[in-house]
Structure formats: structure tokens, C-alpha cells
């Protein structure tokens, strides 16, 4: 069995994983991921008990219980690269023996649910609504660095999207990965469903124009008009595709759920969105406590 070199998986001197600074025993099977470290406190204030709180860089983690169910909530920071770190290190905490540096014989499946904020790209989706990313669409290219990319992606959907948008060849190839079906069933009665884009940036990658124009100024209109059967693209965020793709490759359950705080078609945004986020958090905690 392969022994993972110390240069590939760095374990700190205190037995914690390199970036997250967590020990395996500090990780629950249910993990809620948020971008903002401040949102960790917002979620963990609902916990009945707290067993640990660990902070390193932008990664703040609290493990405790909610209605008797053990959960971990962790901030990832912003962007796809941070999701690559978080999901890989969470999987290592669950499935690598730190003493032998080998994969454990018994696989431990994690449930990874991202709770985020997002901008709607369809006129009928209002600020304050909650969207479940039944499929994540990645503009980032991360999953193509991993073996097995085509095994977890919807290649027909990818081809249809590339053709519809006349996708610029110098950009990373877009990819589509479905959320876990059990998690969709869990949340479907409390959310809208759609295809959610994960962009590798906040400005031009999402069609925003401040001083430098996007390469394709009509891309958002093409995105808005794209349909595949009865499916359509509903919203933008910045992390979900890597979460869905890596979780699928590693065998974990994953989903991204976002509160809409901007209406890109109407060119409006809400800056006082915390009540909407809190409502999403309460809903998600109650749902996850039933697993």
C-alpha cells in the first residue's frame, strides 16, 4: 500500500493537519462549510454543546452538537483554491492513518454542506430565496487536475453549454457535477433547485465590469438563456463546483445551498442580508440533525 510522503500530506508536530490545524478526533461526520469565519459563530451559537474551537488563518472550526447530532462547522475563506485545501484535508482527517501515512481500510464518508450567499441570474428568483445547487457548474478548471474528472462530470451537459455560449477556448473547460441525491431529497422541499455556477473570481468571471471589461460582455445573457431539458442556470457563487467534484471523486456526500443576496438581471443587491442567511442556517441545521 502506498505511503504518502510528508511533502504531499503535511502533518504538524502536534499531530494536526497542515492548514486546518485539526486532529482526526475533532472532526464530525457532518461538516457545514461557510466562507466567512464570522458565520461560524453565527452557526455554532445554535449548538447545544461545543467540544472544540480551532483557528488558523482563515480556517475557523467548531465541533459540537445540535439537537444531539454531532456536527463540525468550518470557514473556508473565499474561492476554489481554498476548497481544494479544505476538502482534501477533511478527507485526510477521516481516511488517512496519520501514524502510517496510509489510507485506512475502512472508508469514512463525510457529509459536506456549503451554506453561502449568491447572485441570481434569472429574473424570477428574488433576493432572500434559497437555492440548492442540484448541479454545480465550474468555471475554474480545478477538477481537471485530478484523475477521474470525466467519471464524475456530465459531459453531454458540458458539450451543450460550450456550444450554446461559444465558450472562449483560452478559458478553463467548464464542468458540471451533480449534488448528492440524498441531500437533494433532504432539502428539496425548502429550497429552489438549479444549476449554480462557481466562478474563479467575483468581478469579470461573473460578468462584472468595473474598469476592465470582461472578455465576453454577453456571456451572462448566454448563461441566462441556456436550458438543457427542463434545467437552467440559476445563480453565481465561488466554491461549489470544487466541493461537488472533489467530494464525488473521494466518495463523500456534498451539496451547496445559497441565499440569494443580489439580482444580477435586475442589477440590484441587498447589503442587509443577515436575516436571510440566518433563516437558511436554521433550516439547514434542522434538516441535517435528522441524518
Could you tell me what each predicted segment is?
Residues 156-228:
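Active-site rim beta-loop-alpha module in soluble metabolic enzymes
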Residues 21-24, 200-206, 278-287:
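Intrinsically disordered, low-complexity segments enriched in small residues
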Amino acid at each position: 500500500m502506498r505511503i504518502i510522503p510528508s511533502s504531499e500530506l503535511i502533518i504538524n508536530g502536534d499531530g494536526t493537519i497542515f492548514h486546518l490545524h485539526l486532529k482526526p478526533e475533532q472532526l464530525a461526520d457532518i461538516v457545514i462549510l461557510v466562507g466567512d469565519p464570522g458565520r461560524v459563530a453565527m452557526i455554532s451559537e445554535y449548538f447545544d454543546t461545543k467540544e472544540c474551537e480551532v483557528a488558523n488563518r482563515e480556517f475557523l472550526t467548531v465541533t459540537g452538537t445540535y439537537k444531539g447530532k454531532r456536527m463540525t462547522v468550518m470557514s473556508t475563506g473565499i474561492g476554489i483554491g481554498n476548497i481544494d485545501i479544505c476538502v482534501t484535508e477533511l478527507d485526510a482527517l477521516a481516511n488517512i492513518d496519520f501514524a502510517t501515512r496510509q489510507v485506512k481500510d475502512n472508508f469514512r464518508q463525510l457529509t459536506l454542506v456549503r451554506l453561502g450567499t449568491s447572485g441570481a441570474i434569472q429574473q424570477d428568483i428574488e433576493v432572500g430565496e434559497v437555492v440548492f445547487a442540484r448541479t454545480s457548474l465550474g468555471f475554474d478548471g480545478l477538477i481537471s487536475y485530478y484523475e477521474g474528472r470525466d467519471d464524475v462530470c456530465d459531459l453531454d451537459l458540458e458539450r451543450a453549454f460550450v456550444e450554446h455560449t461559444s465558450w472562449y477556448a483560452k478559458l478553463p473547460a467548464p464542468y458540471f457535477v451533480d449534488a448528492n441525491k440524498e441531500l437533494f431529497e433532504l432539502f428539496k422541499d425548502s429550497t429552489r433547485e438549479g444549476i449554480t455556477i462557481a466562478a474563479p473570481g467575483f468581478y469579470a468571471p461573473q460578468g462584472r465590469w468595473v474598469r476592465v471589461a470582461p472578455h465576453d460582455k454577453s456571456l451572462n445573457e448566454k448563461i441566462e438563456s441556456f436550458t438543457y431539458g427542463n434545467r437552467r442556470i440559476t445563480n453565481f457563487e465561488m466554491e461549489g463546483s470544487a466541493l461537488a467534484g472533489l467530494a464525488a471523486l473521494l466518495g463523500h456526500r456534498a451539496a451547496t445551498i445559497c441565499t440569494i443576496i443580489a439580482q444580477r438581471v435586475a442589477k440590484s443587491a441587498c447589503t442587509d442580508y443577515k436575516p436571510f442567511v440566518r433563516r437558511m442556517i436554521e433550516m439547514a441545521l434542522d434538516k441535517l440533525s435528522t441524518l
